[in-house]
Amino acid sequence: MTSSENLDSHRLRLDVVTIFPEYLDPLRHALLGKAIEDGILEVGVHDLRNWATGGHKAVDDTPYGGGPGMVMKPEVWGPALDDVAAGRVSGAELDSASLHLKNVRHDELGGVEKRAYVVEEDRDLPLLLVPTPAGKPFTQADAQAWSNEEHIVFACGRYEGIDQRVIDDAANRYRVREVSIGDYVLIGGEVAVLVIAEAVVRLIPGVLGNRRSHEEDSFSDGLLEGPSYTKPRTWRGLDVPEVLFSGNHAKVDRWRRDQALLRTQAIRPELIDASLLDSTDLKVLGLDK
């Protein structure tokens, strides 16, 4: 049985509006490319300049009130989002960069557990994600929720961003989320799209194959993931922890939990919620006093 014969019926459509369509080529590679090939994922990339007018196909103009930089024009973005929401355009449909069908991962052979689509009140509207430093921080919880979506549209801003009226008006046709991937500024939204798309798509049943691969990820249980090891047993004088060879699954699980707790305490202590920890967890962290 191939992985594609064992999949849930859920499919995701991604549409990306950008002035640099070639920037999205990485979506054709690796596991996302395989998801496209397996029919789990569809990706359409739309050049914003197709909606621009005039000889220069300008998509930006000077900001009202003065100040540096340029602002992306509403009369270009508005029609673009209208058409994408209505399915009136067919951008460059991305295909897989290389064939993957004969390269089934060993952890896909065990099958994929199905997951129901999460129904929301406004589920008939596509989800519009606008990457911006001013947006709400993107989290693993967002990725998990959005992996249940059927249609996500990304609006990639550049320069000083998109005229705010575009975002406000889009709420008539979309569920709009302005989202940030970190407290720093990028040149444009395309990099953020690659980050969000990969985080979301990998959670769709059939993409990773082994459901435990993402259940044990960092942040999936509120903690950072602990260290991982593979062959050889000793490398450059460094040994793999003995507990991993014990064959005692309970001890291995406890060790991994302890490592996740200690790593989180050292690197991201703000993620630890003592109210969610049991007595053993608290003892590991020295919080049982």
Swiss-Prot record:
Region annotated Insert, chain positions: 90-123
Keyword Transferase in record: yes
InterPro entries, per database record: Alpha/beta_knot_MTases, tRNA_m1G_MeTrfase_C_sf, tRNA_m1G_MeTrfase_TrmD, tRNA_m1G_MTases_N, tRNA_MeTrfase_TRMD/TRM10
Residues annotated to bind S-adenosyl-L-methionine: 157, 181-186
GO cellular component term, pick one: cytosol
Enzyme Commission (EC) number: 2.1.1.228
Catalysed transformations (reactions): guanosine(37) in tRNA + S-adenosyl-L-methionine = N(1)-methylguanosine(37) in tRNA + S-adenosyl-L-homocysteine + H(+)
Keyword check for Glycoprotein: no
GO biological process, one term: tRNA N1-guanine methylation
Family statement drawn from the similarity comment of this UniProt entry: Belongs to the RNA methyltransferase TrmD family.
Subunit relationships: Homodimer.
PANTHER family: TRNA (GUANINE-N(1)-)-METHYLTRANSFERASE
Protein name per its UniProtKB record: tRNA (guanine-N(1)-)-methyltransferase
Organism: Corynebacterium glutamicum (strain ATCC 13032 / DSM 20300 / JCM 1318 / BCRC 11384 / CCUG 27702 / LMG 3730 / NBRC 12168 / NCIMB 10025 / NRRL B-2784 / 534)
